[in-house]
A protein has these predicted regions:
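Short Gly/Pro-enriched turn/cap motifs at secondary-structure boundaries
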Residues: 196-198, 206, 242-246
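Low-complexity, glycine/alanine/valine/leucine- and proline-rich hydrophobic stretches
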Residues: 224, 229-262, 269-270, 277-280
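A structure-centric feature marking long, well-folded core domains of fungal metabolic enzymes
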Residues: 14, 107, 216-223, 230
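Short acidic-hydrophobic surface loop/beta-edge motif
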Residues: 183, 206-211, 253-258
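Active-site proximal loops enriched in glycine and acidic residues that flank catalytic Cys/His/Asp
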Residues: 210, 219, 266
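One-carbon transfer enzymes
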Residues: 1-204, 259-263, 269-274, 279, ...
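Short, charged/polar surface micro-motifs in flexible loops or helix N-caps
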Residues: 100-101, 190-191, 215, 220-225
Length: 316
């Protein structure tokens, strides 16, 4: 509310959530580096001294009393093309479900419910092939920042042109629990496993069972990108989901899914092992006679975890 002819924002303060990290969340570290005042939720700082509030992946419902402190309300920068993927983990679900188009929505915050307010500005974005959650997050963050600046430059006009969200096409993006990282070999296709890895693999490495022990799988590849793989599989129809082969030329483990096969470059058992080391240490004896045969005992099995365990959501 301090007039300025040159600056779009003349005064800025930051509210962040509590964190167990020594330095707090990244947004707090950034604010401190820029010497901005920082308040920790539920403390929201001075009352009635700001024109507009902005939240991004904040994860807390704002009261009507708090929203009314801002003459222009509170804006939310949401990384999806609403009403698709309302909720705390929209980018994860965009990748998980194989969406080819997403976007960013600048919307007006309403009390008591998440992501239901009117749309102020919205832009679509084509999801790049093979994109991960982390990569898409970086792209949409920059896109959202530019859109927010555009809205703030013409705030009264932007608010006048806001529109309610469509009632159709609503989907929800709930938090993802660590149980989601367990590959269900009998239920998931190769394409679904690859998408799961791209969606949560950088935060929750995918997990399975090997001879009763939990192992983590990393560095997945599509078998279409492995030259000569099709020639190796002779009894494809007989392979039980979870069955393993080793492709020597590319040094890749190949696991059977509900449909198709998926390549794996790294296994974490007691320590991180390359596929060739895992093969030499744990699989070699089965394949001495034929590297092409699928052995029923040589397989991963589905690990079951409680969904109530640790959860993941996108938050700054």
């Amino acid at each position: 509310r301090e007039p300025s002819k040159d600056l779009l924002v003349s005064r800025l303060e930051v509210v962040t959530l509590p964190s167990r990290l020594p330095r707090g969340l990244p947004v707090k570290s950034c604010a401190q580096e820029l010497q901005l005042p920082v308040h920790e939720w539920p403390n929201t700082g001075p009352v009635g001294q700001f024109d507009v509030g902005v939240v991004a992946s904040f994860g807390r419902l704002l009261s009507e009393d708090l929203i009314l402190q801002f003459p222009y309300g509170v804006l939310n920068v949401h990384p999806s093309f609403l009403p698709r993927w309302r909720g705390p983990a929209p980018i994860v679900h965009t990748i998980l479900h194989g969406d080819t188009v997403t976007g960013v929505t600048i919307m007006e915050i309403r009390p008591k419910r998440f992501d239901v307010g009117p749309i102020i500005k919205q832009e679509e974005f084509a999801v790049p092939p093979h994109c991960t959650t982390k990569e898409l997050e970086e792209i949409l963050a920059k896109m959202g920042a530019n859109m927010l600046l555009s809205v703030l430059k013409h705030l009264p006009e932007s608010l006048e042109n806001k529109k309610e969200q469509p009632k159709g096409g609503v989907t929800f993006a709930p938090k993802v629990s660590v149980a989601k990282s367990c590959i269900k070999w009998e239920e998931q296709t190769a394409a679904q496993v690859i998408r799961l890895h791209r969606a949560i693999g950088s935060m929750f490495p995918l997990q399975t069972l090997w001879k009763g022990s939990p192992v983590k799988l990393m560095d997945f590849v599509e078998v279409d990108n492995i030259p000569g793989f099709a020639d190796q599989v002779l009894n494809d129809d007989e392979a039980v989901p979870g069955s393993l082969l080793y492709h020597k030329a590319s040094q890749t483990l190949i696991a059977r899914c509900k449909e198709g096969w998926v390549g794996i470059k790294t296994v974490v058992l007691k320590k991180k092992l390359r596929a060739v080391d895992f093969y030499n240490g744990y699989m070699h004896s089965w394949f001495q006679q034929s590297s092409r045969a699928v052995h029923q005992e040589c397989r991963f099995q589905t690990l079951r975890l409680s969904p109530a365990k640790k959860t993941l959501k996108e938050r700054n």
